[in-house]
Amino acid sequence: MTAGFLSGLLALLLGATGPAPSHCPPGHPACRETYGRIVYVERVDPDGDGDAHFVIVDPQGITLPGLTAIDVRAGLRPHPLPGPGELISAAGPVQTGSYGQSQIHALELHVTR
């Protein structure tokens, strides 16, 4: 079991209705799965490529202790964008962001609506 699955299961057991879990593609060794509550959304894309960024509370702490940043390409960007307090799940490789931070580059993303 992955940490993303376990945190999603914990949220469900505590009464939160969350999104479907996101899964890594088979054979993708650098892929990570995550699930958590949004604390920050970058709604306006400063470089104009149409992606979105989320920061979620995540015990894995891929970006910082207790926090994981998720980069979502334009084609996967949910509409409307979820906001702080909403639950999302994501899976994808961990890559270095423009500020040197570790973040998940989402290949799969699910949002609670």
Where are the predicted features?
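OB-fold (S1/OB) nucleic-acid-binding surfaces
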Residues: 46-70
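Structural detector for short beta-strands of small beta-barrel domains
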Residues: 29-50
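Residues within well-ordered beta-strands of beta-sheet-rich folds
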Residues: 35-37, 89-93
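Short boundary/loop segments of OB/S1/cold-shock single-stranded nucleic-acid-binding domains
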Residues: 12-33
